Design a protein with these regions (language model features):
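Helix/loop segments that flank and initiate small ligand/metal-binding modules
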Residues: 581, 637, 641-727, 791, ...
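Basic, alpha-helical interaction scaffolds
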Residues: 1-11, 465-539, 557, 582-606, ...
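Family-specific functional microsites
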Residues: 708-845
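Arg/Lys-enriched, amphipathic patches
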Residues: 1-109, 157
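Short, conserved micro-motifs composed of acidic
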Residues: 397-398, 442-473, 544, 563-564
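Surface-exposed loop/turn segments and immediately adjacent short secondary-structure elements
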Residues: 69-233, 247, 481-482, 671-673
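Conserved pre-motif C helix in the palm subdomain of viral-like polymerases
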Residues: 2, 9, 233-264, 282, ...
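Short, conserved non-catalytic motifs in the polymerase core
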Residues: 97-110, 148-153, 164-186, 218-244, ...
Length: 845
């Protein structure tokens, strides 16, 4: 198919931007000809064809730019071509490598030398095998469950057509493609054509156990791990795997993920269904509650940083683990064929370099790698579990009941024990055994030892023997600070920095109000959401977050103190009650923390809940429980959240929840507010988002018209710039100004309407009364109202800034075009013949 697809790209999708510009010009010419001869049916047909061609070319062009820009937060809205161009430029500047130090520290600054430095580094990193590797000890594996016959059977068998299709459609279409350049969108959109061939290719692998080498040839793209990388080691290699290969490994993953919860220990929190990252964080938070205090028992915790974890896993170790856990031989061979046969090329500054084979490692970017890595880390846990049979080994305080010796989330590893030499040495000895078996070693410069109640001499001996560094609290674990005292404002600075840094990467010139609004909802508040699942954040931090979001929405920067057009309290209301649908982050914080209250009440089967019942509640009643004074600060905050929820009358709600819903709790925490009748008109799914935002301000009379600006102290001309007669106000601009009246009258005539309302709210009421059953009519009127409001406002602003005023015909033509364009989003198969005729009439008139 490669030749045919290349021809399609050359003749069908070449010069995408030029084709879009040409189609737009042809549409303008056709519309001008039709305007001069409105009764000419041939010109009407030509205009309709030109309109369809332009829509098609524009959609292709926008999708092309969006894929290059990698704006994953932007799901819908305007074409945003300026934003995409800027994002593409920023990505190139950020990802291009102009100079780098090689493995020996020599600076390389020519393209050829840079490529050679990276090839040598990764050929050595991935192409080096371990000569004196120890083998997996079966006695250690027996310290945990092995696969039974039913589980083994679930892993085997040829995939069905439905299984292959489900695997392909589970791959996100906007992910970077592999060496062949075909992303999953191609296969999904053309499944009726290529589905059988994909199924044959996938089935061939499961039947033969061999994979075509072309399917397992991989691009490695290098992602910087630091802001300004200087050495070849400061990059993370991400594999861009072939899409058909991903389909194969997705099938293996779908079978394997159902087995993992039964064989992976509960203190491994990553990539196992039903386990969450916050569980490890919260247990760790409780472990350090006495660190930093005087007169406390000896405790030791080691935060291990694994050096190049995924890249150094030994393949022999993977095979021994799978077979040792009683995985079927055939399944083991499928996995080994996938991970041990890839060939690599490096992508540097957009160009492929080199072609080499690896001898170890799991590819980051391969769907199978995380699950295999979890199985590898299971050996460490079982080794540690075997170690605890030694009666001389002493657990970390509070850990004996659960036999807890470490916490693991992927390659983030914490080891803990009592702060005495023998126990610490046993922990280190068993980790060194794991290193010799798996190939995973500690990065001594980044591994930290934390302690309390220990003699300085003992600590220094451990540091000297291990080569690790001495650490102090607070420290960062899984993205958040771990501290023995209540989290402070200064410890939340990282959260604020993440938000402001993200805003700084965007240009407000390329983002409309609607674009900023979507960025706040999709990105900024999501950054806060992760922290809000773990901590009850300080009120001052939450207020700071609100200030940042408010400044960005109204000013496009994070540091502005200028007032907004609408109060933040009203902005954070739901759309149906007149707001923008942002969350009240203080109440959202309570709602997210309510998950832990619910989990404890329902005794959920996870590590943290077991820890809480073991250490604190024991056999007591949770709803009547009060935390001890010496309990950790975070546990007291969880109990405080419980009291808030009880006071809000949500105890019964939590008890009756079979599955926890943050949204349901949040809905009950926010005050009941009266719905506004105009919300459905403004936020119609067919409206252009930036038009909706403008109309949202206009319907509340919050647009910065001259009369409002002068009240705020602005010195300016108050005469309407569109007519030059009346005083500019919201009422005058949209309904009393002769220019605006003519625009609205033309649209009324075009839509065959007799509406006589003279304000936006009145028109909304009229639309809602007239078109409850007529979907197309309602959508057309909502589109007309929002588009007319937007273009009149933009025209006024253009005149105010010295630009020429657009004529009435031009504004009306723009509104009509956008109405017809957006009506194409309606599924015509579900429309009545009358509504189909209405769309045809609007397109042809």
């Amino acid at each position: 198919m490669k030749k045919e697809l290349k021809d399609l790209n050359k003749h069908g999708f070449n010069s995408i931007q030029a084709a879009e510009i040409k189609a737009y010009q042809e549409l303008i010419d056709a519309q001008q000809a039709l305007h001069a001869n409105p009764r000419d049916e041939r010109l009407a047909t030509v205009e309709k064809e030109a309109s369809n061609q332009y829509k098609q070319k524009q959609e292709i062009y926008v999708q092309f730019l969006k894929q290059k820009a990698k704006c994953h937060w932007l799901k819908e809205g305007d074409s945003n071509t300026k934003l995409f161009y800027r994002s593409i430029k920023q990505r190139r500047l950020r990802n291009n490598i102009y100079a780098i130090r090689d493995m020996t520290g020599v600076l390389k600054d020519s393209p050829g030398d840079i490529a050679e430095a990276f090839q040598q580094y990764y050929a050595q990193l991935l192409g080096t095998s371990m000569q004196d590797r120890e083998k997996v000890q079966s006695s250690n594996l027996e310290a945990g469950p092995l696969l039974n016959d039913d589980q083994r059977q679930k892993l085997l068998g040829d995939p069905t057509v439905e299984e292959v299709k489900a695997a392909m459609f589970s791959i996100k279409g906007d992910k970077s493609p592999g060496l062949d350049g075909f992303g999953s969108f191609f296969f999904q959109d053309n499944w009726d054509i290529v589905g059988k061939e994909v199924y044959k290719a996938v089935s061939s692998f499961f039947n033969s156990g061999k994979i075509l080498k072309e399917l397992n040839t991989t691009f490695l793209t290098l992602i910087p791990k630091v802001n300004c990388p200087r050495d070849v080691s400061e990059f993370r290699p991400i594999a861009c795997c072939n899409t058909v290969y991903k389909c194969i490994t997705k099938i293996l993953c779908s079978r394997l993920k159902n087995i993992l919860p039964d064989i992976i220990a509960e203190n491994q929190g990553a990539f196992v269904h039903g386990r969450f990252i916050v569980h490890n964080i919260m247990v760790c938070q409780d472990l350090v509650r006495r660190y930093g205090r005087k007169n406390t028992g000896p405790s030791c915790m080691i935060k291990l940083d694994l050096r190049k974890a995924y890249d150094t896993v030994k393949w022999d170790f993977v095979r021994e683990m799978l077979l040792g856990l009683n995985f079927p031989h055939q399944f083991t061979e499928w996995v080994m064929e996938c991970i041990s046969t890839p060939m690599f090329s490096l992508i540097l500054n957009g160009t492929p370099h080199g072609f080499f084979k690896s001898k170890r490692g799991l590819r980051q970017g391969d769907p199978l790698s995380p699950l295999i890595f979890v199985l590898c880390m299971e050996y460490l846990l079982r080794t540690m579990r075997k170690m605890t049979e030694d009666k001389q080994f002493k657990f970390h305080p509070r850990c004996k009941a659960m036999a807890l010796t470490h916490l693991c989330f992927a390659d983030d590893l914490i080891l803990c024990c009592k702060g005495e030499p023998y126990s610490i040495q046993e922990i280190l000895n068993n980790f060194h055994h794991f290193s010799k078996v798996a190939g995973l070693t500690a990065n001594n410069s980044k591994t930290k030892v934390y302690s309390c109640g220990m003699k300085e001499e003992v600590i220094n001996n451990i540091i000297e023997q291990s080569g690790f560094k001495k650490g102090s609290l607070p420290f960062k674990y899984l993205g958040v600070p771990i501290c023995s005292k209540r989290i402070s404002v200064s410890q939340c600075e990282k959260l604020i920095e993440q938000m402001t840094a993200r805003i700084s990467t965007w240009s407000s010139k390329n983002l409309s109000f609607a674009g900023r609004s979507q960025l706040i909802n999709s990105v900024l508040l999501s950054i806060h959401q992760y922290w809000a699942q773990v901590f009850v954040l300080p009120v001052s931090v939450l207020r700071n977050i609100e200030q940042i979001c408010r400044a960005f929405l109204w000013s496009g920067v994070w540091y502005s103190t200028a007032p907004g057009y609408i109060s933040w309290e009203n902005v954070c209301k739901e759309k149906k009650v007149g707001g923008l649908g942002y969350r009240d982050i203080q109440k959202w914080n309570i709602a997210t923390m309510a998950r832990h209250v619910w989990a404890v009440a329902n005794k959920q089967d996870n590590l943290w809940v077991k820890w809480i019942h073991s250490v604190y509640i024991k056999k007591g009643d949770w709803w009547g429980y009060e935390p001890p004074k010496d309990g950790s600060w975070y546990w007291r905050k969880v109990c405080e959240t419980k009291r808030v929820l009880i006071h809000a009358g949500l105890k019964d709600t939590l008890l009756n929840m079979r599955r926890f819903s943050v949204k349901a709790i949040y809905q009950q925490l926010i005050t009941n507010q009266e719905k506004v009748f105009w919300a459905s008109n403004i936020w119609s799914r067919y409206n252009v988002p930036k038009h909706s935002f403008c109309l949202w301000l206009a319907v509340q009379q919050r647009l910065p018209t001259a009369d409002r600006l002068t009240k705020w102290g602005a010195q300016m001309q108050t005469t309407c710039g569109l007519c030059g007669t009346g005083q500019e106000s919201s009422e005058h601009l949209f309904f009393q100004c002769p220019f605006s009246r003519e625009v609205l009258e033309d649209l009324k005539s075009w839509l065959n309407s007799r509406n006589t309302q003279q304000n936006i709210q009145g028109i909304c009421k009229w639309i809602n009364r007239r078109s409850k059953q007529a979907k197309v009519e309602r959508a057309a009127w909502n589109l007309a109202l929002s588009a007319a409001t937007y273009h009149i406002w933009q025209n006024k602003n253009a005149v105010q800034h010295g630009k020429p005023k657009q004529g009435r015909e031009h504004v009306v033509a723009q509104v009509k075009f956008q109405i017809c364009q957006r009506l194409q989003l309606i599924n015509v198969t579900k429309l009545s013949s009358r509504e189909k005729n209405l769309i045809d009439c609007l397109n042809s008139s």
